């Protein structure tokens, strides 16, 4: 029910969208007023989220809260239905936090600033809409609405191959989202009543064959967004060409839509099919971890290396979802939140580095840590978080996933051991490619007495208008020595404070969703028990779980032993 009779979630969704409509009316050609206006709207919406959840959300309840439902097209059962629970509420806060800081990170945008901030606010609303939609058709509309601003943000404000990267992103995600629409229609039309309400869809009984088809289709749709191998190839191109603020949202929020969809629809609505697909998810998770790590190490472009790092880290989300344990599913949720913060700050700092050096080629960098010590220190802290250093949020989330897989009583010990061992190999790769990136970019001997910039000799290395770092000295002539500004330090520090806070005291985050993840995992385990009784060969032959043994009847007492 609506708290105090006020539609809080609707207000949170519509505030950025309605505010974006006034941007063309602002008397501002250079964008100075527009950026302050957009930032103010973002802050106001985030404050509204915090107020709403602080006063009207009960973290001890696993049910949907702040429910709003208004009939939209009653003839087909379509309604404006929104709500939050332990799965969606933390992701709403993540979206608000990352998007607001990304608008602050875009302070230097001077190309079509009105259009840029208009698209950022529309994207803000679409992200929130995806996470709070309780109607599957509304979920699909919000999912599609998010594609348009991202496409334009990449294709207009991106790099040299921006149109290729934006088109690839659009084709992948739009084609995959067709499966959401098909699955939604199939579930809505099944049975006697036609409805798109997610709660009512979860109460329907689907034939197992239909569930398996629905699960497979949704896995493809969400797998593209989550960058699951082999559906991930759009991600490195998009990150490589997108501006830093857009990359912050891509890695910090949009990837998490895929993980959210898997938990919300695949696990909650199709638990029987999840029993059969869980080993596939676990295997894909391990492949993601290793494949992403190896490819990341092979990249010489800084943002492409970080993009493949995201592919690797999303493998832990799949492992946790497939673990059948409370701690594993909780770890998957924490990994999404943790990676959202870590990836956002790393892509932001990569953008800060690019603003100074005008290159993402790590081979052309080296020694810039001497000239930009603040950027170096912040980048090092973000890197330590990404490689799961104890005391950082990444360590807690990955540890919980490992514990979840190790303690799973559904799979056989052999399968658990293989999965944990292979995932551990991927964890070993992480410091290799991240620390080597730090070495290439920030360490080195510093500037030489003479260096070649744009094929021109610069003898005076004291000129602050010239940046000649490292041994190659192939930076553009417009590169500068300038260290991080107060604004840039504030943005990075805002992320790092949360990363360290969750790493030191994980309950800051886990208390928001643990009740819900336990409820979801309990539902899936109940489905496993029912299926195992009727099909004792499930996960048989020793590779997965042992065969279910029939209860033994005691001859004397007639009791079940």
Curated annotation (Swiss-Prot):
Record-level Gene Ontology MF annotations: NADH dehydrogenase (ubiquinone) activity; ubiquinone binding
Catalysed reaction equations from the record: a plastoquinone + NADH + (n+1) H(+)(in) = a plastoquinol + NAD(+) + n H(+)(out); a plastoquinone + NADPH + (n+1) H(+)(in) = a plastoquinol + NADP(+) + n H(+)(out)
TM segments?
Answer: 6-26, 36-56, 87-107, 115-135, 136-156, 169-189, 209-229, 243-263, 274-294, 311-331, 332-352, 375-395, 418-438, 489-509
A cellular-component GO term for this protein: plasma membrane-derived thylakoid membrane
Q: What does this protein do?
A: NDH-1 shuttles electrons from NAD(P)H, via FMN and iron-sulfur (Fe-S) centers, to quinones in the respiratory chain. The immediate electron acceptor for the enzyme in this species is believed to be plastoquinone. Couples the redox reaction to proton translocation (for every two electrons transferred, four hydrogen ions are translocated across the cytoplasmic membrane), and thus conserves the redox energy in a proton gradient.
Q: Which family does it belong to?
A: Belongs to the complex I subunit 4 family.
Coiled-coil regions listed in the entry: none
On whether Transmembrane is a keyword of this UniProt record, the answer is yes
This chain belongs to the protein called NAD(P)H-quinone oxidoreductase chain 4 2
The EC category is translocase
| Source species, domain of life | Bacteria
Pfam family of this protein, just one? Proton_antipo_M
Q: Which keywords appear in this protein's UniProt record, sorted alphabetically?
A: Membrane, NAD, NADP, Plastoquinone, Quinone, Thylakoid, Translocase, Transmembrane, Transmembrane helix
